[in-house]
Amino acid sequence: MSLSRKLLVIFFTWITALSMSKPIFVSSDNMNFTFKSFTIRNLTFLGDSHLRNGVVGLTRELGVPDTSSGTVIYNNPIRFYDPDSNTTASFSTHFSFTVQNLNPDPTSAGDGLAFFLSHDNDTLGSPGGYLGLVNSSQPMKNRFVAIEFDTKLDPHFNDPNGNHIGLDVDSLNSISTSDPLLSSQIDLKSGKSITSWIDYKNDLRLLNVFLSYTDPVTTTKKPEKPLLSVNIDLSPFLNGEMYVGFSGSTEGSTEIHLIENWSFKTSGFLPVRSKSNHLHNVSDSSVVNDDPVVIPSKKRRHRHNLAIGLGISCPVLICLALFVFGYFTLKKWKSVKAEKELKTELITGLREFSYKELYTATKGFHSSRVIGRGAFGNVYRAMFVSSGTISAVKRSRHNSTEGKTEFLAELSIIACLRHKNLVQLQGWCNEKGELLLVYEFMPNGSLDKILYQESQTGAVALDWSHRLNIAIGLASALSYLHHECEQQVVHRDIKTSNIMLDINFNARLGDFGLARLTEHDKSPVSTLTAGTMGYLAPEYLQYGTATEKTDAFSYGVVILEVACGRRPIDKEPESQKTVNLVDWVWRLHSEGRVLEAVDERLKGEFDEEMMKKLLLVGLKCAHPDSNERPSMRRVLQILNNEIEPSPVPKMKPTLSFSCGLSLDDIVSEDEEGDSIVYVVS
């Protein structure tokens, strides 16, 4: 539909609406979401909160006394107040949680968890009795409404006992409390799953909290009688948009706090009447006219309303048309300008191919010519009859102007890169609404196909010298990207399927679709976490900050793959138990048997000292603490025997940042495919 036709439709719709005698109603949106189990999507994790097997943990899971606090928040703010109708929303939520003490000593219990509503989505509260809700140094900074599930008696906050629920408003001194053990025989820290329902009805100014042990077989029934019922007007506190979530804490205890599922909804926004011919006031039940009005005949009323509609609509519609025309014209001009600028950048040193030439060379982009799939499109084998050469052509999946501009921007990175261990860009084409990039052809394909094809055929295509050469070549490419380019290039997607092998089995790093440019010695910016599970550094998953250290982690996983002939995440043939490659090699290292990790297909034909060095470099690069990982320049020096490697601890260290994720937690989400993108705050 053309723009002019769209504007006409808008125009006549507007006229029809204005000519009707009834006023128009507009309603505010109510919110509704449900998590039957959790993923990292749509949630923000602060402090020690973490995700394991679809369950949110709020505090560290340690068998020794520890101090911890964590918060998980629904990413999107929720509207609780509608200024047009001056209405505060009602809300209902229910969730299942478990509180369990890992130590049988009852003195090591505490402190509990809370469901909260707050304007703040980035402050981590203090541990202990503060329940991760507020900072002990600034207790009045964070305003909130919360239902606490307290498992420790804290006289500082006037707690009645060590097993109670309470309503907290801007303070941890509860307005009202109830002991579920006395009224419902529910022990909050029993280790059993408990389901809670929290209902606030704004029209009744009433908040009810229900509690029941979760039924493991059938749907848990909501109790008829609330455990806590408070007559309170929350409208002064539920103003504007707020965030909802959970927090939990410990202080010198071994208590864990798990959230298993969660649903939340708002309701009760009243409809708002738009302005009509007559002034009126909106109440809960009726409309009262300020002055008596003589109602004209139906025909006169219709003509009168139509005249008003035309008088109002015509000037507005003209302005709207001019605005829309100007907006799209400016947008088109900016995209064309940006594309021309990027096109000029790419022209330097590169050949511009015609679309017809590439179409013919790939047999019309026939599926039989597909040799790979990258972050932004399919890769085709192209045979140029006139020159007798073979190239690889990448075809972008993004057909929009924005998509092509973004793709050109990404490729401007690799267009200026020159290194023997990088796949070289030969040329490009931008015709018929498509963006095509031409790379040198790698006859031996990708590393993963060679590495894992062997296990099926029994033939070993990669001997020890090839594998060592691949590790050194990849380190050389990354050292160039991280330290020798004018701007530092962080690849963000290093994996065996993105490492190509030339005719002599030399490693060539390709697919820069996720790469980012940064200034040297500048702090990186958090972005969408992107890449492939099993290769992602733990701090990258947690904070979304990609650096040369996250690339180093991926490199460590890759060279362990090369040395061991095993995938990053694999299953034992007999038990079908998931095995993490880094953890497996580290366990063998701790037992003094690290060489037992070597690919059996090599049949012992390798340099033991150098192989051990390669395995230990892999572990050092995959160290959970990013500060302990060597730079790629140092890795290259170690593998070239120019310097000695630094020692690798016998036991795999725990993560040093505040989130309590283990590497198993990080990779356990990879059930449906290779590449996963998460939104991380």
UniProtKB/Swiss-Prot annotation:
Residues 365-643 form the Protein kinase domain. The chain crosses the membrane at residues 306-326. The active site is at 493 (proton acceptor). Disruption phenotype: Increased susceptibility to the oomycetes Phytophthora brassicae and Phytophthora capsici. Glycans are attached at residues 32, 42, 86, 121, 135, 261, 281. GO terms for biological process: defense response to oomycetes. GO terms for molecular function: ATP binding; carbohydrate binding; protein serine kinase activity; protein serine/threonine kinase activity. GO terms for cellular component: plasma membrane. It is found in: Cell membrane. It is an enzyme of class 2 (transferase). Residues 22-305 are extracellular. It is a single-pass type I membrane protein. InterPro entries: ConA-like_dom_sf, Kinase-like_dom_sf, L-type_Lectin-RKs, Legume_lectin_dom, Prot_kinase_dom, Protein_kinase_ATP_BS, Ser/Thr_kinase_AS. It catalyses: L-seryl-[protein] + ATP = O-phospho-L-seryl-[protein] + ADP + H(+); L-threonyl-[protein] + ATP = O-phospho-L-threonyl-[protein] + ADP + H(+). ATP binds at residues 371-379, 394. Involved in resistance response to the pathogenic oomycetes Phytophthora infestans and Phytophthora capsici. This is Probable L-type lectin-domain containing receptor kinase S.7. It comes from Arabidopsis thaliana.
